[in-house]
């Protein structure tokens, strides 16, 4: 949340979590920074909506509610939940075009999360392939097979600056912490 925001808003949409986990997720960035609140951080849990309602809600928040305010980062955790079927070419193209339009019109970065196929590192479905082709950076998180409890973060590809692979673990309080004795993949 700190970064180089310069007063811009961070808007986080979660499509999968139930209210208990969504609430914990919404509070985590504030706790990590030692803040009680941040008027520029907005979190929305969309689990109970269908895919069309989710798209319309996101459009409303970005293009109506915060229309005249500077948005720096939009996080959509659950891009697959913006379509009825991740292999539907038409819906996948619509979502890809929506994301590109929003990032262009709002002059902001949009980060989406999409799962990979089982037994593969490829993003799920036609939607995953479409987003992969247009993304600025593709970052993969996976459970570390050597050190249990660690999550390894790898920059699979980037149009600009890549970063070195690193790992983190969750502390007892549920907050992530970089692992100092990380290993090379």
Enumerate the language-model features and the residues they cover.
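Phosphate-binding/switch region of NTP-binding enzymes
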Residues: 5, 12-13, 73, 90-181
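Conserved inter-motif catalytic segment of the P-loop NTP-binding fold
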Residues: 4-90, 94, 171-175, 181-183
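P-loop NTPase nucleotide-binding module
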Residues: 1
